[in-house]
Amino acid sequence: MRAKAARAAARPKPGTKPVSDAAVLTKAVVRAAQLLSFSQRELARILGVSEATASRLCAGSYQLSAARMKEWELALLLVRLFRSLDALWGHEEAAHTWLASHNVALAARPLDLVPSIEGLVRVVNYLDNARGRL
């Protein structure tokens, strides 16, 4: 019964336009970057796009696209990072403190690792493992 109700709730209401995956991911990335206090320059490095593109993304005049696979996948990882931090700590200040603190298991500050693809994947995997223990 719950699955049926969930499917019904997920359907667009009559007279409304369905929201694209690109619009949802774009909004989630911008919101995550804001809540994690990432500058547009940092967001550009994380997504592998130019600073101008990151600026347009934050202004709402650029949308992520699954056709641009690299930025799409990095955006998904950034949202996973945010969701994991939120699940583990529940508020921004604790997440900021964790990101800025040296982590022995990662051998660095997570904030320093996130701008590289390898570092972002390592941090997300670390957080996924931490969430799995909850």
List the model feature ranges, each with a label.
Residues 1-134:
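Non-transmembrane "mature" sequence context
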